[in-house]
Regions:
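A cross-kingdom marker for long, charged
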Residues: 247-251, 259, 387, 467-492
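Flexible, glycine/threonine-enriched loop-and-boundary segments that flank and lead into catalytic domains
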Residues: 367-381
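Sec-dependent bacterial lipoprotein signal peptides
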Residues: 1-17
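Active/binding-pocket-proximal capping segment
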Residues: 333-364, 409-413
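A conserved glycine-rich beta-strand in the N-terminal activation segment of trypsin-fold
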Residues: 133-198, 378-460
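Short, exposed beta-strand/loop patches in secreted or surface proteins that constitute
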Residues: 134-139, 224-225, 358-363, 384-387, ...
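Structural boundary/hinge residues at secondary-structure and domain interfaces
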Residues: 19-109, 113-131, 166-222, 227-324, ...
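Extracellular/lumenal glycan-associated surfaces
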Residues: 45-49, 108-114, 142, 147-150, ...
């Protein structure tokens, strides 16, 4: 369905202030009473413009200098609809967009609302239809359903009248129970539909049937978003049976890595994830286990017995500003420093021999650091540094950064004001199952400079409209059988 008329401006209502924050409760979207339980996706936008949160979200949108132009473009593409005059008086308190299935490239989509004023809504559709292909409507119960073809309207009507509704579906109710009804937007994705689509895609590529069931049965995906005076909150959940149940941990590496990171990703127990990936690959590629054994024989160590135990603890990946290229850092806490040193010394030797690159050992703070020099790499020169020390394995692309990792940084990420503020804004608890942090205020201009140095043209509009973005932090945590994903983007 091409996004037109009410659907376009419902989306703008979401951006501009379609209610957020506060409230409480977990009532289902009203459209769930008519949307068939077989639907693949439901996105419910709160268009109750009388909400007090409307002012907050309007203020948030106005921080972006390109917002007025975005509204004008949307209006022009929708028959010059005026939000205040045409849309606001017509829409009901909720607009829902429904994917009936994932067939035909995901185009089996309809939109629903209960018009505030039927005449105003009819006028809205007529005006929106003045340009491009028409948007058609029909009535299903108390709801007006819109689509770009009569076939889709008929498909929705048939599905709605012949089976149970989303409001009766337990997976849907469980997913919605975690989402505040006053949020600007709530979204639900039927897990079975997604899993089947993934399995079909993998099977089409030669994988065995039902490959993803090795991980578990995906029941649902759900998410919400809402704004406050500082920025945008978002929260999502993944329901899988059996539950993923990752072990929560208190990250300590932010207190050991330098401050000023543009990007920082924290993880734990990567051994479990790697085992799952290896199992899936083994099922997909009949010769994989044999080939892996041959590689292990050359390297002189076992992935399962030697490497994976080293990945059982906290790990971090970080990016720092540098010229001409950023500095990359990987630090993994290892239980056996001596084993880590042996494995990575052997691995670096094989890499150096196979790629014909230079290798040497540098003493840094009493630690032997292995330097790999890639003389044949395209400019600028590329060097990498590896070391195992004090229960950690470290990799970086900058010698000075390796020295900080070994001897201790001048200031740590834990003490970085931007990182501390991002954690506070996101409400991140002391223990999570992983998190990712981005310093957008410094990182986006750095990325623009890097792209420009590579010959790309960065529009001035892109620079202006990303300037209000300060930080973003996303973290995962357990909630019963759900894996929750929560976060906050700070906008000033």
């Amino acid at each position: 369905m091409r996004v037109r008329a009410a659907v376009v401006l419902a989306g703008l209502a979401l951006l501009a202030g379609g209610c957020g924050g506060g409230g409480g409760g977990n009532s289902l979207p009203a459209a769930a009473d008519v949307v068939p339980a077989s639907a693949a996706v439901l996105i419910s936008v709160n268009t109750d413009f009388s909400s007090a949160q409307w002012k907050r979200e309007l203020a948030l949108m106005r921080r972006f200098p390109g917002a007025p132009q975005l509204l004008r473009r949307a209006s022009e593409q929708s028959g010059n609809l005026d939000f205040g005059r045409d849309v606001k008086p017509a829409l009901g308190p909720e607009v829902d967009v429904v994917w009936l299935d994932f067939a035909r490239g995901g185009n089996d989509v309809v939109a629903l609302t209960q018009p505030k004023n039927k005449k105003r809504f009819a006028a809205l559709i007529r005006k929106g239809n003045s340009t491009g292909s028409p948007l058609l409507t029909t009535k299903v119960g108390d709801w007006t359903v819109a689509a770009d073809s009569r076939a889709k309207l008929a498909q929705f009507r048939q599905a709605s009248s012949s089976g149970k509704k989303l409001a009766d579906d337990q997976a849907f109710k469980d997913a919605m129970a975690k989402l505040d009804q006053s949020s600007a937007v709530r979204a639900y994705v039927a897990g079975g539909r997604v899993q089947k689509a993934l399995d079909d895609a993998f099977e089409g590529g030669g994988a065995p049937p039902h490959l993803t069931t090795e991980v578990g049965r995906l029941e649902s995906l759900s998410a919400k978003a809402e704004a406050d005076e500082k920025g945008l909150h978002f929260d999502g959940a993944i329901a899988i049976d059996p539950a993923l149940a990752p072990e929560p941990f208190a990250a300590t590496l932010p207190g050991e890595l330098p401050g000023g990171a543009l990007l920082y990703v924290s993880a734990n127990s990567l051994d479990d994830m790697t085992r799952t990936v290896l199992r899936l690959v083994s099922r997909s590629l009949p010769n994989f286990d044999t080939q892996l054994s041959q590689v292990e024989a050359v390297l002189g160590f076992s992935v399962q017995r030697d490497v994976l135990p080293l990945l059982a603890h906290e790990a971090a990946f970080a990016v720092y500003p540098a010229r001409p290229l950023p500095t990359f850092v990987v630090v993994i806490k290892v239980g056996d420093t001596a084993k880590a040193k042996r494995i990575f010394s052997r691995l670096s030797g094989v890499i150096a021999l196979g790629l014909n690159i230079n290798t040497k050992t540098l003493p840094v703070g009493g630690v032997d650091v292995t330097e790999l020099d890639f003389p044949h790499a395209p400019a600028p020169p590329v060097k990498t540094f590896f070391a195992a020390f004090e229960g950690k394995f470290a990799f970086t692309t900058d010698e000075a950064t390796m020295r900080q990792l070994i001897e201790g940084p001048h200031s740590t990420l834990e003490d970085d004001p931007a990182f501390a503020a991002a954690k506070k804004d996101a409400g991140m608890p002391g223990k999570t199952t992983g998190f990712a942090y981005a310093n957008l205020h410094d990182g986006l201009p750095f990325a623009f400079r890097l792209a420009a140095a590579g010959g790309s043209v960065i529009p001035a509009e892109a620079r202006r409209n990303t300037k209000p973005l300060r930080t973003a932090l996303v973290y995962t945590h357990e909630d019963g059988k759900l894996l929750r994903v929560s976060g906050f983007a700070t906008i000033k």
